[in-house]
Amino acid sequence: MLGSAYSMYISAQEVTLKSTDLTVSIAENGFYRSIQVQNEELVETGHSPLITACVKGTLVQPEKLELKKNVLQLTMQDKNVITLSYSETPNCITLEATKVPAGYDAILFGPVKVNINEVVGDVVGVVQGRGVALGVQAMNIKTIAGIPDEYIKQVKDFYQCSGKSAELSVGSIPDYKLAAVDLPDGAAFLFSCRNRSRAEKRQVQQLQNMEVLPVKGADAAINGAKIALFGCSAEQALERIGAIEVEQGLPHPLFDGEWGKTARSAMCSYLITDFSEKNVDYVLDKSQIAGFKYIYHPGPFEDWGHFNWSKSFVEGGDDAVKALVDKASQRGISVGVHTLSNFTTTNDAYVTPVPSEHLLKQGRLELLMDINNSQNEISIKKTGLFALPMTLNAMMIDQELITYGEVKEEDDKMILKNCKRGAFGTVAASHGKKSPLYKLWDYPYKTLFPDLELQDKYVDRLTELFNKTGLKQISFDGLEGCSYTGQDDYAPARFVEQFYRGVGHNVLNDASRLSHFTWHVHTRMNWGEPWGEAMRTGQVENRIKNQNYFKRNLFPRMLGWFLIRLADKKFECSTMEDLEWALSESAGFDAGYAMNISVNTLKKHGQMDQLLTAIRNWDMLREKKCFTSEQMERLKDPSTEWHLEKESENLFSLYPLSITKHYHCSLGELQPGQPGGADWSISTPYAGKYAFRLKVEGEGYIENPKFVTEKGTIAFPCKVEEGQYLLYGFDGKAHVTDKNYNIIASVVPQGDAEVAAGDSHIAFACDKDEESAPDVTVRFITRGAPEKIHYQ
């Protein structure tokens, strides 16, 4: 504890704690009398307790506060006593529960209700308003954001703290799981710590009475639960959290000496591709064209659990991965890999041939008879464990795994039918009636889960392979699977912190879920998007929704994954216009992204190097903050289109584009004697030259297409066959290409035909194959005057 500037004093009515910009006064009944940040009063006297205890389904508040031997002693309504140690530093005030009655189920720090909510950082635990910020930070993984599940209704009803959930692309986070809840008249901070020392039956994944094993070690007890409170000006909130991390020993990842939450490199874009040791040189070549500093493999493992490497990735295990990583490092590129955290494949050695006793169990089933080693109908006592459909339908008895096909109820028993004995390569055996039969948790990915003890071994293996190989990026996908243990946000935080503490170098990382404590570890969040839509329509609203989530939680911004594809039955090959739409969104939101390009696409896309160069140019300008705030506002609008052109090393031109709808000409629907063609109405804000993308579909071909406007005629002496394109650019060059834009022939246009601004007409004509009648689809692109962007 520091000297007099931050020392605690006590009067007859209250205890006061101080830190820079923050003064906290606690009344003699154990309730907050005042919380002031820069002299702004943020609480109403007597509404927020220092601690609420959760005991046997009831809430117990404090009724008396005393200072004894430099600790705060709270006498609760049930006459039990909780002691809290405290500290005051320039950065924060900490409160740690040092003695909590063993019979308590959990404690809440507060809840603390405040009267500001201009910006509510619901996950990070920072509320801003009237120019100031108040924050609460958990100091360890046992102290979690939100309310224990069994006490949600009591707490929300009693303290009137129901508010907004956190909405993001992967789903919403309910208000009772948040660090700070946005309320109609302010906000509420919610932090808790539960007693994890005993085996319990809890609700897990919508199932009641699931088996939850006790936690071993110091994390099991409520003693040690700890928070930090801080106050500052709103613009200093992020900086203050960084200082608290360093001071209090929280995770504080650095990128080249700079904190990850402020480093520009935290929002760097990266390449996702299915490279291997056999083609990594080619992938590195392409990565350097795009300026990517990270390449990331989406599926390098043969199994999840032991995390053995797939032979299609490398053939020499960890040593071969290290050689690959070293090769990339010599070219300034880091390598990352994808995991599904604690998801466990059924080919892993923790499952087969002898399953680990630490596979995660839902609960125990009671056999009604002995079973032999081939019996495929098994009778058990009736249970509620089958209320939620599973995927693998796996059970464990002794050293055998069994799967069932269906469940039939008969009176007070259930019959498991179509059982597969010795499932997943285990050995079928006979078992006595009293042998424990366990129903296992699984996931729709056809995976199982470990309990916490086995989960730790998964992390040990991941830290081992990262330390040994030098890998520098990981995605903790499926991190929510850790919560299947019944240990809420503690379980994923344990996974992430153990990995962070165990790896000897900084690892850029993201995850499928962001929680309060893992905020300190994760570099950023970056979710994959479904590939069932075109790039510019794939979850646009969700991508934008995520930006608001990142901003209010003081977190590096990412736009998600984008896919560059080859042509298939449903989609055309990705275009430069599609890509630059995504890149302009990235520039507008100042958010990184992942570009998913398979090695096959890298090789077969005819414009790949141009696309990669565009990525490099846009990212260079974004990373150096070369776009003005006014330009960024326009760029982030998803209805706008843009093209960036490099003029010199330090000068770029940014063109606004107008891209028309698709115009169609069905050559099979012409009247007798009518020449092939169509008349189209076009509307564009930009006059002058245009580019276009013409595609021929259906049987046959066209020849000599031409376009006529009120300003002239332009013709293209060429033949375009089924599935081919005629591409015409603003540079005056035209090419016939295949479906993936590989050039088949270059074409010299004849004439010129500019368009006028506003509404006008374009006439299309062509010669066609007399024996067939293909369809022609055309999309026109016009552009406005460029804005000059200087790279510095």
Short names for language-model regions:
Residues 17-295, 327, 334-335, 472-473, ...:
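Carbohydrate-recognition beta-sandwich/jelly-roll modules
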Residues 29, 82-92, 105-120, 385-400, ...:
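Extended Gly/Ser/Thr-rich low-complexity repeat segments
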Residues 236-255, 288-296, 320-363, 432-433, ...:
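Glycine-rich, aromatic-flanked loop segments that form ligand/cofactor-binding clefts
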Residues 256-364, 441-459, 463, 469-486, ...:
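Aromatic-lined carbohydrate-binding/catalytic grooves of carbohydrate-active enzymes
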Residues 321-345, 350, 358-365, 585, ...:
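Carbohydrate-binding surfaces of carbohydrate-active enzymes
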Residues 341-428:
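Autoprocessing Asn-cyclization modules and mimics
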Residues 346, 350-364, 440-457, 500-602:
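Glycan-recognition surfaces
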Residues 421-429, 433, 684-792:
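Intrinsically disordered, low-complexity segments enriched in serine, threonine, and glycine
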